Amino acid sequence: MTFTDLNTENKNGWFDVADDWLKKDRFIFIGWSGLLLFPCSYLALGGWLTGITFVTSWYTHGLASSFLEGCNALTAAVSTPPNSMGHSLLLLLGSEAQWDFTRWLQIGGLWPFIALHGAFGLIGFMLRQFEIAKAVQIRPYNAIAFSAPISVFVSVFLIYPLGQSGWFFAPSFGVAAIFRFILFFQGFHNWTLNPFHMMGVAGVLGAALLCAIHGATVENTIFEDGDSPNTFRAFNPLQSEETYSMVTANRFWSQIFGVAFSNKRWLHFFMVFVPVTGLRMSALGIVGLALNLRAYDFVSQEIRAAEDPEFETFYTKNILLNEGIRAWMAAQDQPHEQFIFPEEVLPRGNAL
């Protein structure tokens, strides 16, 4: 027996009204995720543009870092707070700035502002993909894939400095600043010899290779290419059916490699799996570095190189280079520690 609810009164509470308005069909979809995405993205991007244009890093790193000071698009950055600030959120209303906006900028308050709003903005974008996927009734693999770069951002900009002594050891937001951070990672963590970095490189470069191969193969096997020998003339968005042959592609790669993907689902899943796994493995490696876990150490080679001046490997050469990075970076990057290294302790050896 079926019962019918005869109470047809329209239940328009505040949530229903908000839900209808947020999900209204408009040029730019807002949705519930937009309440997180748009404000956080606006504040993060606005804070970064303000920082690289006007704000100095003289009080935090002893550097010029803005367009106003003569930097260009590659050398400008929003620098991390000084090491003395530890893990403070550096709120404008906090004890460090006390509502003094200029002081807040001087002590590096923009960096945690951008990092936190940027992280929540990225999460909002992932939730946006979930929300729209549900609305149009497709699977949420786009959102799942986008979670991989989010994991990298969170591990590098938030988890790593949380494992160290302060935000100071996170990357500053700028191109040259990121390069400096990469050199720092190599010198202090031997990052290139970390297996998680190796998996990350394999995932990202492998994904680029897969993308190039896939695009070329589809173009190779087009069989309804318009009335012209020129492929580009046939890029017609009004064509309703696909016009490439999976069978032909399978036959081609079977002859090239001896193996080939048997169906499109497995092929495209693999194209998702490779980069996502690589990025997540690299993020996991960064979490390890936050805890100061070491990369591969070939101590026997180091001992033999120390005893025998004629023995060296590419590994021992890199170890000496890492020592050089540490010695030079520590003094320049942490001026408040007042490190002074006499000439005799700087790395000298077979490799340098």
UniProtKB/Swiss-Prot annotation:
Disulfide bridge partners, by residue number: none
Binding site for chlorophyll a ChlzD2: H117
Residues that span the membrane, as ranges: 40-60, 124-140, 152-165, 207-227, 278-294
Residues that coordinate or bind a plastoquinone: H214, F261
Subcellular location: Plastid, Chloroplast thylakoid membrane
Enzymatic class: oxidoreductase
Protein origin, superkingdom: Eukaryota
UniProt-listed InterPro entries: D1/D2 (IPR055266), Photo_II_D1/D2_sf (IPR036854), Photo_RC_L/M (IPR000484), Photo_RC_L/M_CS (IPR055265), PSII_PsbD/D2 (IPR005868)
Gene3D superfamilies noted in UniProt: Photosystem II protein D1-like (1.20.85.10)
Keywords for the protein's UniProt record, in alphabetical order: Chlorophyll, Chloroplast, Chromophore, Electron transport, Iron, Magnesium, Membrane, Metal-binding, Oxidoreductase, Photosynthesis, Photosystem II, Plastid, Thylakoid, Transmembrane, Transmembrane helix, Transport
A Pfam family recorded for this sequence: Photo_RC
Catalytic activity as recorded in UniProt: 2 a plastoquinone + 4 hnu + 2 H2O = 2 a plastoquinol + O2
Residues reported to bind Fe cation: H214, H268
Any one Gene Ontology cellular component term annotated for this protein: photosystem II
Residues bound to pheophytin a: Q129, N142
Membrane topology: Multi-pass membrane protein
GO molecular function, one term: oxygen evolving activity
Enzyme Commission no: 1.10.3.9
Cofactor binding: number and manner: The D1/D2 heterodimer binds P680, chlorophylls that are the primary electron donor of PSII, and subsequent electron acceptors. It shares a non-heme iron and each subunit binds pheophytin, quinone, additional chlorophylls, carotenoids and lipids. There is also a Cl(-1) ion associated with D1 and D2, which is required for oxygen evolution. The PSII complex binds additional chlorophylls, carotenoids and specific lipids.
Purpose: Photosystem II (PSII) is a light-driven water:plastoquinone oxidoreductase that uses light energy to abstract electrons from H(2)O, generating O(2) and a proton gradient subsequently used for ATP formation. It consists of a core antenna complex that captures photons, and an electron transfer chain that converts photonic excitation into a charge separation. The D1/D2 (PsbA/PsbD) reaction center heterodimer binds P680, the primary electron donor of PSII as well as several subsequent electron acceptors. D2 is needed for assembly of a stable PSII complex.
Similarity section: Belongs to the reaction center PufL/M/PsbA/D family.
Assembly: PSII is composed of 1 copy each of membrane proteins PsbA, PsbB, PsbC, PsbD, PsbE, PsbF, PsbH, PsbI, PsbJ, PsbK, PsbL, PsbM, PsbT, PsbY, PsbZ, Psb30/Ycf12, at least 3 peripheral proteins of the oxygen-evolving complex and a large number of cofactors. It forms dimeric complexes.
Extra information: 2 of the reaction center chlorophylls (ChlD1 and ChlD2) are entirely coordinated by water.
Protein name from the UniProt record: Photosystem II D2 protein
